């Protein structure tokens, strides 16, 4: 793909790159943000923060401040990644992810829909969380890089959007398409498949890794209590290492558990009444379409017998070369009716993926944190803003549940969706996903247990209580492999 490199306007100040960075961070005004919030942070003997606010936004403000005290560098370093300007700080190493953020149009989605897709109480909560980070930065100037400030609520929202994509392996599909040769055949209706062909174990250094969560019903436990074990396997340091906290407000929020630094809500944990754990799953949630390009116009593709125009735009990737030289790389971004488009030496491809245009992840986590019973927790999960993850649930009323959470597309069962798809048929551009009640799940099984260890959702409890694969048409792309921990 052709691109243009332009020397930055600050080329004459090669030794003063900071002069090229502009920001709207007024430390003096941000240092007064604490006057708006009523919150107390206490730490237990292990240093775990217990945050008590008068309202949920008060709690969010204090929660952010506590996280910043413990993990400021991780939070700050993530901001350029979410904004698509990490190459300014890391050079060419960050250019690829910067292009990914811009190619996906994440910020356009947030700018257009932030006010409409997120409820007022969620916006107030996330904005208070951003205030807490900025208050910490303003009162600790020796620890922060002001060129990355201020943090906004939209930064937090985009961060969730991007991380959810990476958790189910979207980036792996993009890397595959960009390889030197085409990796898969184009599917035809005769290649319909009952199960996906390429489910893969999650590995590190060749060894299987992953997480575990299991719930035990009262009638299956010796003491007659509901039990939930959360055994999520994450690194001990870094941006996806668990951070433990307890957050509480006087308006109903009261939850403790683990999260990744920079998250405004608890990801796995418990309240006074309910608890849940999560494990990574790998359903097939990304489809690749091979486009037929007009030989007389490279910006047109065939769809339903007609030539359609590709959407075209140009984005600037700002870099710093050799640690001091600012450059700007201009790159073309294309999109078809299917989704974002990539040109390669072996073809032009459109990518369609679960979660396109979805920004409500922060709201769903918040609703889960506020849930007080099984019904409210399921209502939160029925938002279906998460593209993936398995969940194991338990509560003090004795309910247990396994949920294979995924934005599973409703695909044409005549095609093998683990292959590439012909891009000239609009009927293959799926627009709907399975409803919440249609996802593989187990509620209060007679067996008395459910477990999740990154395995297929069709083997999570006793055989008689498992979801049945035969209830689903081919093409949904459910994960079919077992893991060594699930057997």
Show the residue positions of the predicted features.
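Structural recognition of the beta-strand scaffold that forms the well-ordered cores
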Residues: 49-52, 227-229, 266-269, 275-278, ...
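Glycine- and hydrophobic-rich flexible loops that cap the catalytic core of alpha/beta enzyme folds
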Residues: 258, 269-272, 278-421
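C-terminal motif of bacterial Sec signal peptides marking the signal peptidase cleavage site
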Residues: 18-19
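Sec-dependent signal peptide recognition
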Residues: 2-11
């Amino acid at each position: 793909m052709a691109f243009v490199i332009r020397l930055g306007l600050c080329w004459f100040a090669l030794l003063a790159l900071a002069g090229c960075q502009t920001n709207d961070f007024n430390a003096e005004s941000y240092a007064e943000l604490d006057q708006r919030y009523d919150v107390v942070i206490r730490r237990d003997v292990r240093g775990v923060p217990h945050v008590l606010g008068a309202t949920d936004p008060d709690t969010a403000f204090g929660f952010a401040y506590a996280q910043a005290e413990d993990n400021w560098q991780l939070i700050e370093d993530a901001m350029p990644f979410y904004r698509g300007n990490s190459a300014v700080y890391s050079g060419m190493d960050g250019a690829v992810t910067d292009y990914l953020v811009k190619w996906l149009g994440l910020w356009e989605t947030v700018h257009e829909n932030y006010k409409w897709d997120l409820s007022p109480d969620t916006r107030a909560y996330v904005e208070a969380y951003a205030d807490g980070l900025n208050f910490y930065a303003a009162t600790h100037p020796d620890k922060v890089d002001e060129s990355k400030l201020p943090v906004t609520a939209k930064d937090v929202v985009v961060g969730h959007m991007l991380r959810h994509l990476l958790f189910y392996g979207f980036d792996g599909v993009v890397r595959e398409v960009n390889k030197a040769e085409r990796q898969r055949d184009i599917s035809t209706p005769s290649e319909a498949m009952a199960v996906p062909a390429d489910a893969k174990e999650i590995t590190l250094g060749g060894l299987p890794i992953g997480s575990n969560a299991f719930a035990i019903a009262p009638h299956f436990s010796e003491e007659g209590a509901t039990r939930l074990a959360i055994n999520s396997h994450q690194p001990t340091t870094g941006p996806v290492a668990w951070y433990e906290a307890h957050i509480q407000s006087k308006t109903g929020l009261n939850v403790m558990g683990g999260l990744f630094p920079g998250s405004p809500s608890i990801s796995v944990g418990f309240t006074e009444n309910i608890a849940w754990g999560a494990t990574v799953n790998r359903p097939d949630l990304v489809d690749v379409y091979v486009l037929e390009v007009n030989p007389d116009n490279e910006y047109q593709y065939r769809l339903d017998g007609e030539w359609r125009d590709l959407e075209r735009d140009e984005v600037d990737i700002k870099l710093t070369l050799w640690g001091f030289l600012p450059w700007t790389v201009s790159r073309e971004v294309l999109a078809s009716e299917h989704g974002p488009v990539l040109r390669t030496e072996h073809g032009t491809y459109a990518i369609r993926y679960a979660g396109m245009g979805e920004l409500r992840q922060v709201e769903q986590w918040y609703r889960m944190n506020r849930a007080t019973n099984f019904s409210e927790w399921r209502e939160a999960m029925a938002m279906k803003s998460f593209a993936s993850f398995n969940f194991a649930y338990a509560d003090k009323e004795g309910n247990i549940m396994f949920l294979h959470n995924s934005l599973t597309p409703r695909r044409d069962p005549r095609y093998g969706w683990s292959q590439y798809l012909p891009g000239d048929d609009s009927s293959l551009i799926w627009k709907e996903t399975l409803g919440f009640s249609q996802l593989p799940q187990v509620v209060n099984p007679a067996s008395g247990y459910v477990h999740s260890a990154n395995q297929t959702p069709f083997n999570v409890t006793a055989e008689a209580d498992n979801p049945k694969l035969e209830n689903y048409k081919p093409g949904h792309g459910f994960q079919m492999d077992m893991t060594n921990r699930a057997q």
